[in-house]
Amino acid sequence: MATLHFTKGQGTGNDFVLYADPDGTLPLSAGQIAEICDRHFGVGADGVIRAVRSKRLPEGAEALADDEAAEWFMDYYNADGSAAEMCGNGIRVYVRYLIESRLVQLADGDTLPIGTRSGVRDVQRTLSGFQVDLGRWRLAGGEPLVRAKELPVARLGLGIDLGNPHVVVALADESELESADLTYIPHLEPAPQGGANVEFVVPHEPLVKDGVGRIRMRVHERGSGETLSCGTGAAAAALAVRHWAGENAPGQWWVDVPGGTVGVRMFPTEDGEHVALSGPAELVYTGALELA
């Protein structure tokens, strides 16, 4: 029976079990991951992150081909054991874990490339946490009809791809946002192949202050259920509201989630507009468990 030494971490309440497996010799099964993430019988988490060197995984080899400095791969899994392409909060916590575990060195202001299933993502250490360049984004998936429990009227959502799929839904006010029961999976028509993360948003009043937009969001994450925060979901929500607000909408946003607040910034690059996510990353405790 193997012993798994792990660290519990969180970014605005989006929590993860992280463990180091540099040589790729300790993969977990979907069943083991689901047991670890169970909040009653396991450690409890929204997902599991394995720290593995990119050269030890086929997906990591692709990351190295893209950027030879992407030594580390974020092998991320949802709470149900399914593999995920990307996690905006998770990658910040992952880099904090690599630093605290002395697997990498990263000074304030420096950037570290990390391999993910959606490509290489650059993470910068800041005075207040970490900022990750989520790369190019695109409208994808059209405008599916979204039904959620306790919301009596179906709404049109906006599909956005950030390396993982999102559908963003605008609600009328705070009371609607509070009433949605996200313990149930929102129903999408047409249903995207492989599912999607679904974000429900309302604007602050005023929507824009001092050139910065602000919205409030709740999310149902594919494979994990409702979480206190979703980093790529916050970015998708800000992008959607900017899209709806028109050409004079700002390129910088605060997104309030149940677990705190994250920053989203859109900026031009040579290969198109990118979106960056900034926020805290905390390591909570370490532990060990016996794997069945």
Swiss-Prot record:
Catalytic site positions: 87, 230
GO biological process entries: lysine biosynthetic process via diaminopimelate
Enzyme class: isomerase
Marked site: Could be important to modulate the pK values of the two catalytic cysteine residues: 166, 221
Pathway: Amino-acid biosynthesis; L-lysine biosynthesis via DAP pathway; DL-2,6-diaminopimelate from LL-2,6-diaminopimelate: step 1/1
Superkingdom of origin organism: Bacteria
Binding of substrate, residues: 14, 78, 88-89, 164, 197, 221-222, 231-232
Entry EC no(s): 5.1.1.7
Catalytic reaction equation(s): (2S,6S)-2,6-diaminopimelate = meso-2,6-diaminopimelate
Purpose of the protein: Catalyzes the stereoinversion of LL-2,6-diaminopimelate (L,L-DAP) to meso-diaminopimelate (meso-DAP), a precursor of L-lysine and an essential component of the bacterial peptidoglycan.
Subunit and partners: Homodimer.
Protein name: Diaminopimelate epimerase
Species per Swiss-Prot/TrEMBL record: Leifsonia xyli subsp. xyli (strain CTCB07)
Taxonomic classification: Bacteria, Bacillati, Actinomycetota, Actinomycetes, Micrococcales
